[in-house]
Amino acid sequence: MVLASISEALISQGDGGERVAKRQRSAIVLLDLDILDCPICCEALTSPIFQCDNGHLACGSCCPKLSNKCPACTLPVGHSRSRAMESVLESILIPCPNVRFGCTKSFFYGKESAHEKECIFSQCSCPSSVCDYTGSYKDLYAHYKLTHSTNIFWNIKRFRCANFFTTSMLISDKILIKRVHEKKLLLAVQCFREPCGVYVTVSFIAPSAPEVGEFSYQLSYNVDGHTVTYESPEVKRVCKVSIETPQENFMLIPHSLLRGDLLEMQVFIIENVDQE
């Protein structure tokens, strides 16, 4: 269910500011999101929306695929816009999916994806494969510290940003968790063994909210006089660690430079602060 304003669909005059003001003052009703799906592809309707002479709707993506022929009645479709339905879409306010966790934000239909990525109330999953806990990134930090700190397998360490630290992990363990104490963040160091070598990547378990901050990092691996380094202007922020080999933002260590299962690296994390 979503919150929706219906009076905006009846407004047909006034400048942009007046339309926004009237939209915000309009009545609120409940709608089922399913009725906002294209009846053909079942994807969410977005402008432009078309209709045939019998009133059957079709989204802009479906019309060309149907050769502009309505599948319900075979009448032409793709030439006449459904302005009424487009006005309804413009009037709909959707509460954040994290409303039950405390988020009070709402946004107009079609703008929800941008907010969800940055919502501070987004639920983050515990990186332990034997734990199904989810919570805000700060609650996850507290949970991990309390529940998994004594688990040697996870080898939790604490460090501060803007400092080099050396980390050791077994490639077969695949993941190592570090705690950033002052930020209440969990840093996941992951490695993936593939035929061409070992992929190493790091990420914070947190949403992409401004409150979390932005960070850059450097990885360095040294063995027998050989050095492999990788620098990135951004530490990825994820709500759940992936078990898939990364396609970007990784350091690749060839098998010829590996010495058994132990992987020892130097990591440098620094918070990016705008200089104004």
Swiss-Prot record:
Pfam families: Sina_RING (PF21362), Sina_ZnF (PF21361)
Class of the enzyme per the UniProt entry, highest EC level: transferase
Zn-finger (SIAH-type) residues: 91-149
Residues that coordinate or bind Zn(2+) 2: C126, C131, H143, H148
EC number: 2.3.2.27
Alphabetized UniProt keyword annotations: Metal-binding, Transferase, Ubl conjugation pathway, Zinc, Zinc-finger
RNA-binding keyword on record: no
Domain of life of the source: Eukaryota
GO biological process: protein ubiquitination
Zinc finger (RING-type): 38-74
A GO MF label: zinc ion binding
Residues binding Zn(2+) 1, per UniProt: C96, C103, H115, C119
Catalytic reaction(s) noted: S-ubiquitinyl-[E2 ubiquitin-conjugating enzyme]-L-cysteine + [acceptor protein]-L-lysine = [E2 ubiquitin-conjugating enzyme]-L-cysteine + N(6)-ubiquitinyl-[acceptor protein]-L-lysine
Chain spans, region SBD: 88-274
Protein's pathway: Protein modification; protein ubiquitination
Annotated signal sequence range: none
Domain commentary: The RING-type zinc finger domain is essential for ubiquitin ligase activity. The SBD domain (substrate-binding domain) mediates the homodimerization and the interaction with substrate proteins. It is related to the TRAF family.
Family from the record: Belongs to the SINA (Seven in absentia) family.
Functional summary from the UniProt entry: E3 ubiquitin-protein ligase that mediates ubiquitination and subsequent proteasomal degradation of target proteins. E3 ubiquitin ligases accept ubiquitin from an E2 ubiquitin-conjugating enzyme in the form of a thioester and then directly transfers the ubiquitin to targeted substrates. It probably triggers the ubiquitin-mediated degradation of different substrates.
Protein name according to UniProt: Putative E3 ubiquitin-protein ligase SINA-like 9
Gene source species: Arabidopsis thaliana (Mouse-ear cress)
